[in-house]
């Protein structure tokens, strides 16, 4: 976000007051993003760039003054730009907010953060008692919201990240068996299977409702001959040398710290020699500079908003150590925005 700063020297008292309000503004912009998505504002402006507030209100059936205030506020935070008397999406936000078929569509993400923000009502009590409320106890509606918000993550991986990981890409092209740990609603399972027709995919998750969502998605996509989803934890696999690739998307940081060594060991056992383990996750910043800089500081924020779930976001160094302790060797690495991507190989 933007904030006024003193031209030279340390920030003034007024600067810091403005900074506080700028931080609070993020709460309200999160709600604006979701309200605009629900109303269809972003998609309407992708269809008709240059539409003025009154015309947009007519198309959406909304109040013209309310619609104009929404657009002006979105403009003030860089989401919209002027086009003559009307509005258009700012650079790249047409893909990010206005095109559900885009690989980079993230318009559902604000909704998830609004839902998980409800946990904050209990934070003071958790702080005082040292208690947790695990992710899996948040109910079916929350699981649906998460599945919807994360369904583009595998597309981002396949379209933008995988080309930077030639070893893993070659293995997937060859085909074989793939295990997705923490499959959630099944989007990684089906999208990887659709992209690589010689690959069969198995998804596992400890949350039963998410597994049912994944099973339904597999059936809807006509992939039941190559894809499965099971309610199972990774340490219940009981399979040795069974998979060419194991994937995990935003899952490793959600495994309880006491269970992580066993989970990594189970993955190592399940991989065939020469197989790959993909960790697409957050990595907690290891320096003050990265702790204070976007996008890396978002991992610290993830540790904060998932704090009472019992999650611990590992640093990159800690992830490497976990791989080594399980007998895996880091083979490839890259990053995308807030995400750290590691590929470890089984010798």
Where are these regions (language model features)?
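Conserved Class I S-adenosyl-L-methionine-dependent methyltransferase catalytic core
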Residues: 23-27, 35-36, 44, 68, ...
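Core SAM-dependent methyltransferase catalytic element
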Residues: 326-347
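C-terminal alpha-helical "lid/dimerization" subdomain adjacent to the S-adenosyl-L-methionine
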Residues: 280-326, 331-333
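A short glycine-rich, Lys/Arg-flanked "PGG" loop and its adjoining helix->strand segment in the class I
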Residues: 261-273
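Class I SAM-dependent methyltransferase "Motif I" SAM/SAH-binding loop
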Residues: 182-186
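A short acidic, Gly/Pro-enriched loop at the edge of an enzyme's catalytic core
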Residues: 235-246
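A short SAM/SAH-binding and catalytic strip from SAM-dependent methyltransferases
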Residues: 244-258
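Class I SAM-dependent methyltransferase SAM/SAH-binding core
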Residues: 189, 194-235
């Amino acid at each position: 976000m933007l904030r006024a700063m003193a031209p030279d020297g340390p920030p003034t008292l007024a600067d810091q007051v403005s900074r506080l309000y700028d931080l609070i503004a993020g709460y309200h912009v999160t709600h604006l993003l979701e309200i605009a998505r629900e109303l269809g504002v972003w998609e309407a402006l992708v269809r008709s760039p240059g539409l003025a507030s009154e015309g947009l209100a007519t198309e959406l059936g909304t109040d013209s003054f309310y619609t104009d205030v929404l657009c002006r506020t979105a403009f003030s935070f860089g989401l919209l730009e002027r086009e003559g008397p009307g509005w258009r999406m700012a650079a790249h936000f047409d893909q990010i907010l206005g095109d559900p078929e885009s690989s980079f569509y993230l318009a559902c993400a604000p909704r998830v953060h609004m839902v998980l923000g409800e946990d904050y009502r209990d934070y003071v009590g958790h702080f005082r008692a040292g208690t947790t409320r695990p992710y899996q106890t948040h109910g079916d509606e929350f699981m649906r919201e998460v599945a919807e918000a994360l369904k583009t993550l595998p597309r981002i991986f396949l379209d933008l990240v995988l080309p930077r990981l030639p070893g893993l890409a070659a293995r997937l092209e060859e085909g074989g068996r793939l295990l997705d740990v923490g499959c959630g609603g099944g989007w990684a399972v089906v999208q990887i299977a659709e992209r690589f027709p010689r690959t069969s995919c198995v998804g596992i998750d400890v949350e039963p409702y998410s597994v049912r969502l994944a099973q339904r998605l597999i059936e809807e996509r006509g992939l039941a001959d190559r894809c499965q989803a099971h309610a199972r934890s990774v340490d219940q696999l009981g399979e040795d040398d069974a998979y060419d690739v194991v994937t995990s998307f935003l899952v490793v940081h959600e495994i309880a710290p006491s269970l992580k060594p066993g989970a990594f060991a189970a993955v190592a056992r399940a991989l065939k020699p020469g197989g790959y383990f993909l960790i697409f996750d957050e990595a907690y910043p290891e320096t003050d500079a990265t702790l204070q800089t976007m996008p890396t500081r978002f991992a610290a924020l993830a540790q904060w908003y998932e704090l009472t779930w019992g999650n611990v976001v590992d640093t990159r160094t800690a992830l490497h150590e976990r791989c080594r302790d399980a007998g895996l060797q880091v083979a490839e690495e890259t990053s995308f925005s807030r995400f750290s991507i590691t590929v470890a190989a089984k010798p």
